[in-house]
A protein has these predicted regions:
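ASCE RecA-like P-loop NTPase motor cores
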Residues: 1-253
């Protein structure tokens, strides 16, 4: 983090972005923190939109599988003034991409709808955005302060990436889960059946979707390296190599 801050301070602009490691969740729990996942998505989005020249991360973050570049591109919304969209259509797209509807925006990955006004807080932005519609046409887009709820600056367009790394096609995932349920038994089978029921009940997401990360993204090359077309600099190579070796042992176990 300090290296990232130092680079940005020297250049007087945010050209370096931090990639934290993702906290995977494999068991049912009442609440799941997506803080680091949102930070990762923010960095990945800035990378594909050329807002970030350098990606800084630790060994674990760099080696972790992530949403493939083409999947991120396909599921990222670019909303511009003058675009035509219905509130129902926009709401459905946001929910499918992991956003949570709220009465008032309080943090990342939330959105709210009040009349013809839509507020969204994408993980790649420092401030939430307010979209005002005139009928089905987008009239204005602006940033607003999360505390005062007052508009700050007007913009012509905004990039809205998914709010989760696990983007999935419902029918595809249902098919894979049914196969898993048929070929397994015990607790794991019960977990899978419960997740199938969640999907069939029209729920937009599965809290423990991380269980199926390798099903959604089977390619072992789906890491941050698929986003990089330049050079890679490794600091303290031997330490990184040993840490990576131990990390793979833990993953295998």
């Amino acid at each position: 983090k300090k290296l990232c801050e130092d680079i940005n301070r020297l250049n007087n602009s945010e050209i370096a972005c931090l990639l934290p490691s993702k906290e995977f969740c494999f068991i049912d729990t009442e609440s799941i923190s997506r803080e680091y996942e949102h930070a990762r998505l923010g960095t990945l989005t800035k990378s594909i939109t050329n807002q970030c020249k350098y990606i800084i991360g630790g060994v674990e973050a760099i080696l972790q599988k992530t949403i493939p570049k083409e999947v991120l591109l396909d599921n990222t919304l670019k909303i511009s003034t003058g675009d035509n969209i219905t509130l129902n259509e926009l709401s459905k797209l946001l929910v499918n991409n992991g956003y949570v509807r709220a009465e008032k925006i309080e943090g990342y990955a939330q959105f709210s709808i009040r009349g013809d006004i839509v507020d969204i807080f994408p993980p790649n932005e420092e401030n939430p955005v307010r979209i005002e519609l005139w009928g089905e046409d987008i009239d204005t887009i602006s940033y607003f302060d999360i505390d005062t709820q007052r508009r700050i600056d007007s913009i012509d367009c905004v990039t809205v990436p998914p709010a989760k790394e696990s983007v999935f096609n419902k029918d595809f995932l249902l098919s894979k889960l049914k196969s898993l349920a048929d070929t397994h038994s015990g607790d794991f089978q019960n977990y899978v059946i419960k997740d199938i029921q969640r999907l069939n009940s029209q729920l937009a997401d599965i809290p423990t979707i991380d269980r199926y990360f390798s099903i959604l993204y089977p390619n072992l090359d789906d890491t941050i390296f698929s986003y990089i077309d330049g050079f890679v600099c490794i600091s303290e190579y031997d330490d990184c190599k040993n840490y990576a070796k131990n990390l793979w042992i833990q993953v295998a176990e």
